């Protein structure tokens, strides 16, 4: 259609005055876009999928919800009104049916990560997190997979992780004894140090000194910032920002963060390659990966190392800190449950190990229920159907559509969960979990599922188990500070994570 229109314009303007030609081109452009909008809205296969009338014509309402930090609530409200399959934009659909969501994410699925994920790369190349090509993702994941198994983590890293967590908890305990201590900040430092140590042997002393690794500091300027949002939704403003960044320091920090991050990342590469040459594979995940990929097409370049380090830090730090913060808030809001948990972890005889913690039924039920309601990634996980489209949930999804699934809805759907909005850890106790319906099993995926399941699922769970055990052993009787309220802890959808509104949660040991 576009080619035919172009030919018609060229024929119509041949020999015509310039003003007439420009006016005709402008009119044709407007007409073409109007026809495209109407065709997509009312004649696409997506027209059969229910949704608000305006979503067929524009994604402005959806975009507004992203900037307002309430996309998960907006999309969930559409599911409440229109059902498990809802059209949320001209070429975007959200799926809340557990079986259909499983089809989108299962092993061997025909759906791939949507172009949106290119924005989430901290570097100029694709990384372990955002590869759209399944083969390339599989090759890269294979380089890291062994280092992230539970067996390897316990064997090589549990001691380091335990010491780091213990130190963070002691810092909280010292502060809480004299006033308020802020949980999310300490959990973030803890998670930063653990991931830095594991990936590139960095981050030493992060918790002890209360100062993040330089690479992490630069990465945070790159993460989920205004530049990412503008590049995705309003590209012209992104390029204006790049120009202004040449003369304004603050704008430079935002719009040139990638370049600065790579400068700070030189130490990551140096550490990885030095440890590889020294054979210190247990001390550096990237050293292991370099060894695994030596002589192979999948071997890592310096750019790959920095970009993957950034991706692993983003995926491995904030989610753990956020999840622990919400979990402790939920427990401290329920004094009787707090006492039960304190008694369970106090019953540990001897050293606190992950093997022991994995066998604590109450603690693990609390962890799962907190992640059901307040998982760190409640928002959409956009995917693209294959060439030629695909059938999903009783509808045909054409090529070029974005298909989302969001845990905020899957984890709180009343059709799947009894008293879905209520925190009830007992549903995850071993005897009750055995009674889970197939629908519940498909719906509960706080770490994702299929071949794109979180690479650090075992690390995340190990950290949470040890952190919860240490915290409630050392800070027995801790209470929420006055600043920690339901309002301050309301979930805000911050583009890639669900965070407390005030981005903090204070507790105290003082009477």
Curated annotation (Swiss-Prot):
<protein>
    <recommendedName>
        <fullName>Cytochrome P450 monooxygenase cypX</fullName>
        <ecNumber>1.-.-.-</ecNumber>
    </recommendedName>
</protein>
<dbReference type="GO" id="GO:0005506">
    <property type="term" value="F:iron ion binding"/>
</dbReference>
<keyword id="KW-0349">Heme</keyword>
<dbReference type="InterPro" id="IPR017972">
    <property type="entry name" value="Cyt_P450_CS"/>
</dbReference>
<keyword id="KW-0479">Metal-binding</keyword>
<keyword id="KW-0325">Glycoprotein</keyword>
<dbReference type="GO" id="GO:0004497">
    <property type="term" value="F:monooxygenase activity"/>
</dbReference>
<comment type="similarity">
    <text>Belongs to the cytochrome P450 family.</text>
</comment>
<dbReference type="InterPro" id="IPR050121">
    <property type="entry name" value="Cytochrome_P450_monoxygenase"/>
</dbReference>
<dbReference type="InterPro" id="IPR036396">
    <property type="entry name" value="Cyt_P450_sf"/>
</dbReference>
<feature type="glycosylation site" description="N-linked (GlcNAc...) asparagine">
    <location>
        <position position="162"/>
    </location>
</feature>
<dbReference type="Pfam" id="PF00067">
    <property type="entry name" value="p450"/>
</dbReference>
<dbReference type="InterPro" id="IPR001128">
    <property type="entry name" value="Cyt_P450"/>
</dbReference>
<feature type="glycosylation site" description="N-linked (GlcNAc...) asparagine">
    <location>
        <position position="407"/>
    </location>
</feature>
<keyword id="KW-1133">Transmembrane helix</keyword>
<keyword id="KW-0812">Transmembrane</keyword>
<dbReference type="GO" id="GO:0016020">
    <property type="term" value="C:membrane"/>
</dbReference>
<feature type="binding site" description="axial binding residue">
    <location>
        <position position="454"/>
    </location>
    <ligand>
        <name>heme</name>
    </ligand>
</feature>
<dbReference type="GO" id="GO:0020037">
    <property type="term" value="F:heme binding"/>
</dbReference>
<comment type="pathway">
    <text>Mycotoxin biosynthesis.</text>
</comment>
<feature type="transmembrane region" description="Helical">
    <location>
        <begin position="18"/>
        <end position="38"/>
    </location>
</feature>
<keyword id="KW-0503">Monooxygenase</keyword>
<keyword id="KW-0560">Oxidoreductase</keyword>
<keyword id="KW-0408">Iron</keyword>
<dbReference type="InterPro" id="IPR002401">
    <property type="entry name" value="Cyt_P450_E_grp-I"/>
</dbReference>
<comment type="function">
    <text>Cytochrome P450 monooxygenase; part of the fragmented gene cluster that mediates the biosynthesis of dothistromin (DOTH), a polyketide toxin very similar in structure to the aflatoxin precursor, versicolorin B. The first step of the pathway is the conversion of acetate to norsolorinic acid (NOR) and requires the fatty acid synthase subunits hexA and hexB, as well as the polyketide synthase pksA. PksA combines a hexanoyl starter unit and 7 malonyl-CoA extender units to synthesize the precursor NOR.</text>
</comment>
<dbReference type="GO" id="GO:0016705">
    <property type="term" value="F:oxidoreductase activity, acting on paired donors, with incorporation or reduction of molecular oxygen"/>
</dbReference>
<keyword id="KW-0472">Membrane</keyword>
